[in-house]
């Protein structure tokens, strides 16, 4: 999605693609090309089962982030984007009870609080490393996406799982956890649009990417199944991985430069029609 958007702007693009089996670490260790702009989107990640079940695998992200930041400084790349995550926010702020919006200032890199699992620690460390790279002259935008989704998302994530269940017309409709946990959903096209708008505005530092709207998994299931034209019974699995209870952004910084356009309902319709 990002590649397509940049290509549409006429950029000359070089990709280091992990999916092809290449070792991105080797690229950052040995390549000395100076680019005008660099994006770091790569990470070992997956759904909740992957984050909880493979902490050492996810920890590999630390090496990737470190070599990327060193490469930025070594090559003198003047402008860069680091995709962090909402998982970097302290889990203590994402507990049951009233929904608390997460502000960029809730992460203090001088006094770091417990983030969400190894994945959150890796992203938090990546943000710390970005600060060191900035001190060496590279201006870095740190994007903190919340619950990104889209029509072509990997099926290990909740959104495509819900879409597939609705396409099969599952009844009962299975939901991991109580169904009351909330997430802040933002479509991949809006994530891409927001990132480029922030770059155009020459923004640096951390920016939340989200709508600022709390949607429970029960509500997501109802939206998806209503769009699919049926109303199943919801079946909750308390034994399945659940993650934090609430994760919702305060998107004020983003909204100064970009307003998302694809509602969750529209995103669901697109996915069901794919």
Please report, for each region that a protein language model flagged, where it lies by residue:
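C-terminal substrate-binding subdomain of Rossmann-fold SDR/epimerase-dehydratase oxidoreductases
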Residues: 167-274
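NAD(P)-dependent short-chain dehydrogenase/reductase
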Residues: 92-101, 124, 128-184, 188-199, ...
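NAD(P)H-binding glycine-rich loop region in Rossmannoid oxidoreductase-like domains
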Residues: 27-62
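Adenosine-cofactor binding site in Rossmann-like domains, unifying the SAM/SAH pocket
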Residues: 11-30
């Amino acid at each position: 999605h990002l590649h397509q958007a940049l290509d549409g702007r006429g950029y000359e693009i070089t990709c280091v693609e992990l999916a092809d089996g290449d070792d991105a670490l080797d690229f950052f260790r040995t390549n000395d090309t100076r680019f005008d702009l660099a994006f770091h989107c790569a990470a070992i990640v997956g759904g909740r089962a992957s984050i909880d079940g493979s902490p050492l695998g996810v920890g590999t992200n630390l090496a990737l982030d470190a070599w990327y930041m060193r490469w930025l400084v070594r090559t003198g790349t003047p402008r860069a984007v680091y995709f962090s995550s909402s998982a970097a926010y302290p889990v203590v702020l994402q507990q049951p009870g009233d929904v608390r919006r997460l502000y960029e200032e809730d992460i203090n890199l001088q006094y770091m609080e417990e983030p969400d699992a190894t994945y959150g620690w890796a992203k938090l460390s990546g943000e710390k490393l970005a600060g060191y790279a900035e001190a060496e002259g590279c201006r870095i935008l740190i994007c903190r996406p919340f619950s990104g989704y889209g029509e072509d998302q990997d099926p290990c994530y909740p959104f495509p799982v819900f879409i597939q269940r609705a396409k099969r017309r599952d009844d009962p409709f299975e939901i991991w956890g109580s169904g009351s946990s909330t997430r802040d959903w933002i479509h991949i096209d809006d994530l891409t649009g927001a990132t480029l708008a922030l770059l155009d505005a020459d923004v640096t530092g951390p920016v939340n990417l989200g709508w600022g709207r709390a949607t429970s998994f029960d509500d997501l299931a109802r939206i998806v199944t209503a769009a699919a034209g049926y109303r199943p019974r919801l079946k909750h699995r308390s034994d399945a991985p659940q993650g934090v209870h609430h994760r919702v952004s305060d998107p004020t910084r983003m909204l100064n430069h970009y307003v998302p356009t694809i509602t969750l309902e529209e995103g669901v319709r697109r996915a069901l029609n794919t």
